[in-house]
């Protein structure tokens, strides 16, 4: 009986630690929900991507030039606005606006999902770019018999995909079951 009690206590501690590492940030919850709904992607995908990309730091400037919650580069921001959203491009400073950053990131993830149809491939393209992923998909060394990526030759992109997929699984377990 005592061991069962310790088991429940350990599970509770483990869950609390996981929720600390993979939070539902109330600060961005409404914008994440709205952007996911607007662009037809599962809310959990945005939570996992933001957690992995920026850890919810809206002013983060990444080493690759990415800015904000979704770590979009100014070039990606312009491409998303003009090619996907069919909008006039705004100043890259808008990437620091969490709502705009999330909207553009969600639009891009939606576009990538329509293009690839598999979340692992979507996350690879989100990290490495579509031209790179398209080249990998044409190389039999990197795809399985179904034409899906089986291994990612870029270690940084492979780690990113693994991390986002892990975050997705934990967000589902903790909040979206």
Where are these regions (language model features)?
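Hydrophobic membrane-insertion alpha-helices, especially the h-region
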Residues: 1-11
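Cell-wall polysaccharide-cleaving catalytic domain and substrate-binding groove, primarily
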Residues: 51-76, 108, 129
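Catalytic and substrate-binding regions of cell-wall glycan-acting enzymes that process beta-1,4-linked
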Residues: 124-177
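Surface-exposed patches in mature extracellular/periplasmic domains of secreted proteins
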Residues: 44-47, 60, 116-125, 175-177
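Export/targeting segments at the very N-terminus of extracytoplasmic proteins
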Residues: 9-58, 81-84, 167, 174-175
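Solvent-exposed, polar/charged alpha-helical surfaces in well-ordered, non-transmembrane soluble domains
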Residues: 30-34, 47, 78, 103-110, ...
């Amino acid at each position: 009986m005592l061991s069962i009690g310790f088991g429940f206590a350990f599970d509770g501690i483990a869950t609390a630690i996981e929720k600390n590492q993979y939070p539902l940030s109330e600060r961005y919850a409404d914008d994440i929900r709205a952007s996911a709904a607007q662009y037809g992607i599962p809310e959990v995908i945005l939570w996992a991507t933001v957690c992995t990309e920026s850890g919810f730091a809206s002013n983060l400037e990444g080493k690759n030039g990415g800015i904000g919650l979704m770590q979009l580069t100014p070039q990606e921001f312009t491409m998303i606005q003009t090619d996907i959203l069919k909008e006039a491009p705004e100043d890259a400073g808008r990437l620091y606006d969490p709502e705009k950053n999330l909207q553009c990131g969600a639009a891009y993830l939606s576009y990538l999902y329509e293009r690839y149809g598999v979340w692992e491939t979507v996350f690879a393209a989100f990290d490495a770019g579509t031209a790179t992923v398209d080249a990998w998909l044409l190389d039999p060394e990197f795809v399985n018999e179904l034409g899906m990526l089986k291994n990612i030759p870029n270690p940084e992109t492979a780690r990113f995909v693994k991390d986002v997929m892990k975050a997705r699984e934990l967000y589902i377990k903790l909040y979206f079951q």
